[in-house]
């Protein structure tokens, strides 16, 4: 007896990303490689012009702290994209995600072309940022 995706009880959360790469509707949401939900909708936020992704999380996983974060990953080198859920800390006072919540901490997809460009030409911005980070760390 295979239960269809639409029959599974779930709650919806959403998140915005700078770049979703090739992420598609029905792409899996995984925690440690285990599928706990799926992308249910992708649209462009009309105010920010950033991709807004709606995710249906299976109801059985209803104890996910709101301190959790999302990152878009790729299965293998050229495989399908999915969203990895990094479960946040829970100190007993942190609220759990519920229907309609927004996950704020997101990391965009690494686009293969960008990675190749960084490898071939170097990324001057990263080097500048590293120097600034080191200066900031030394001053504290």
Model segments located where?
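Surface-exposed connector loops and short turns at secondary-structure junctions
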Residues: 59-67
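Short beta-strand/strand-turn micro-motif
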Residues: 18-54, 65, 72, 80
């Amino acid at each position: 007896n295979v239960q269809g995706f639409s029959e599974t009880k779930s709650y919806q959360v959403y998140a915005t990303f700078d770049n979703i790469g090739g992420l598609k509707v029905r792409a899996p949401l995984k925690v440690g490689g285990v599928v706990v939900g799926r992308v249910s909708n992708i649209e462009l936020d009309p105010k920010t012009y950033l991709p807004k992704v709606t995710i249906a999380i299976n109801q059985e996983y209803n104890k996910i702290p709101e301190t959790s974060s999302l990152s878009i990953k790729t299965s293998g080198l050229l495989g399908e994209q999915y969203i990895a859920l990094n479960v946040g800390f829970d100190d007993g006072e942190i609220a759990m995600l519920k229907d309609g919540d927004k996950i704020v901490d997101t990391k965009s997809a690494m686009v293969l072309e960008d990675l190749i460009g960084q490898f071939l030409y170097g990324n001057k911005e990263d080097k500048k940022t590293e120097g600034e980070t080191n200066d900031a760390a030394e001053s504290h």
